[in-house]
Amino acid sequence: MTKSKLRILAVGSQNSGVTYHRLALPLSIMEKEYCLITDTITEELLKEKNFNVVVINRFLESVPLLQLLEWRQKFGFKLVVDIDDYWSLFDKHLSAGTYRKLGITRIIKDFIRYADLVTTTHNRLYLEIIQINKNCEILPNALPFDKDQFTAIKKDNDRVTIAHTGSITHYPDIQQLKRPIEELAKSRVFRENTRMLLCGWNEFNKWHWNQMGNLYTANEKLEYKIIESLPVDLYMNFYLEADMLLVPLLDNKFNRLKSNLKALEAGAKNIPILTYKRAPYDDIPTIFEVDNWERDIKRMAFSKQMRDDFGYRNGEYVREHYDIFKINEARFAIYSKLIE
């Protein structure tokens, strides 16, 4: 058996979900000679460790592209840029102003343009990327199901617990639930038998989180629980108490180019995911397709049989199609070919 020659430097932000899922998690369990996952890249590090592959997500904040390209020429490594989101934000995205002010969209496109290889999560993003760089490969998001934090272990609840997970960037998306949740809160039976679970709270965006909390609990008319953001290696604890997951994405190009990771997370816990039957979830046949949020939340909340059926079907599907060990076989082959 030929020993792997891959010496990989993966650079990403600490405690970043993107770094965790696209770099740290897959590379930590992939075959290689050596891999260092860090938030810092320096000339001294490149010289000392003799890396032949440098992998980053989107762009580097700490090192200009020109400097990185000079290092590539000097040390001979291959530059892999991983893209998991579209580089142009919609106007209501909370980071849209920052992207415009700092020119981040242009910066990301430049990193894509000069990469030796671009990897991405699905075909929709692939079709956007190859307009900039033809050297692109699809490596879907994937999980090590039934291992570590991705086991199906859950807590028993005294109420049906309805979860929303994610960062504050979903603030515009969750607005779609305002009226449906207000109507649900008028139902005594719903109030007495459910709990709203809002996960990811962060004091840094306190005003927006307060608004989301008020919306998701109908101004505290519904019983609720809020869980603060967790380290990436513990974040699946969000789902320990969840009986169903709501994913109300607005229909815009940025969201259509997102990945289906939430379906994988729900599947790891064998719980149903309620969302629209459109990208990024139209390739998951086991979602519960939402047509009317008020009606569909109520239907799922009031039927344990439905929750079990949709949850276990989703769990089976994602385990078959998004197993990280299978995806890593492709990742290993792609990286190995790159350094031949």
Regions inferred by a protein language model and the residue ranges of each:
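N-terminal pre-catalytic "stem/leader" segment of glycosyltransferase-like enzymes
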Residues: M1-L60
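Conserved catalytic-core segment of nucleotide-activated headgroup transferases in glycan assembly
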Residues: Q14-I29, P144-D148, K155-N237
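Membrane-proximal helix-turn-helix segments that form the acceptor-binding/catalytic region
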Residues: E70, T98-V118
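Donor nucleotide-sugar binding/catalytic pocket of nucleotide-sugar-dependent glycosyltransferases
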Residues: R113-Q149
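Nucleotide-sugar-dependent
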Residues: P172, P231-F238, D243-E265, L274-I284
